[in-house]
């Protein structure tokens, strides 16, 4: 289950990095956890988010509303952005938690993590715009007007890296096994509206 993945991996960084004098590690872990956490809400709705993030897995678990989880994640992102702006960690510091010999999202630049955090805020805002338009607009504007900004076309956008081309299971399924293809109904919709993403998202046989 999802609670066995990112929450377990990020727990120590979130809870112990500050006492070790490395709050920037906490900031990065909060951003990664936010990226995973908001998708849990989007996929499943209510979830025992606080229990999972504190590594509590045995019942009874306290399920929280999606809106409450979103608010927690917004707070986490605000904290992470604040920490990174205050600390402005060096590339050498990031080398302790990122393999900078391989191209990653930040490439050792703390500003890229801030941009990524702002992009998550924007995505969350768009997800909630029909439920709470006022808060959605506020969060979206907060992200795009931030002094560091958001990821643009000139920035790297791949937050993961793979030492082998087929190390990503989805890439292997789609490209080696040829098992993921565009459905005829979706293709028809894209063609009917002359949608430009048809040629951006999909390759021809």
What are these language model-derived features?
Residues 1-32, 36-205:
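Structured, solvent-exposed acidic/aromatic patches
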């Amino acid at each position: 289950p999802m609670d066995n993945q990112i929450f377990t991996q990020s727990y120590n960084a979130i809870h112990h990095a500050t006492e070790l004098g490395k709050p920037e590690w906490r900031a990065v872990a909060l951003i990664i956890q936010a990226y995973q956490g908001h998708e849990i809400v989007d996929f499943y709705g209510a979830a025992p988010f606080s229990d999972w993030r504190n590594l509590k897995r045995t019942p009874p678990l306290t399920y929280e509303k999606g809106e409450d989880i979103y608010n927690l994640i917004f707070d986490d992102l605000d904290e992470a952005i604040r920490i990174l702006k205050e600390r402005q960690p060096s590339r050498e510091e990031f080398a302790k938690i990122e393999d900078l010999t391989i191209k990653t999202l930040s490439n050792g630049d703390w500003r890229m993590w801030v941009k990524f955090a702002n992009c998550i805020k924007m995505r969350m805002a768009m997800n909630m715009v029909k439920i709470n338009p006022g808060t959605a607009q506020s969060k979206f504007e907060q992200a795009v007007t931030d002094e560091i900004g958001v990821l643009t076309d000139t920035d790297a956008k791949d937050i993961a890296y793979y030492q082998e081309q087929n190390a990503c299971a989805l890439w292997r399924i789609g490209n080696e096994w040829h098992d993921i293809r565009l459905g005829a109904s979706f293709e028809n919709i894209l063609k009917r509206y002359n949608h430009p993403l048809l040629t951006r998202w999909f390759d021809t046989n």
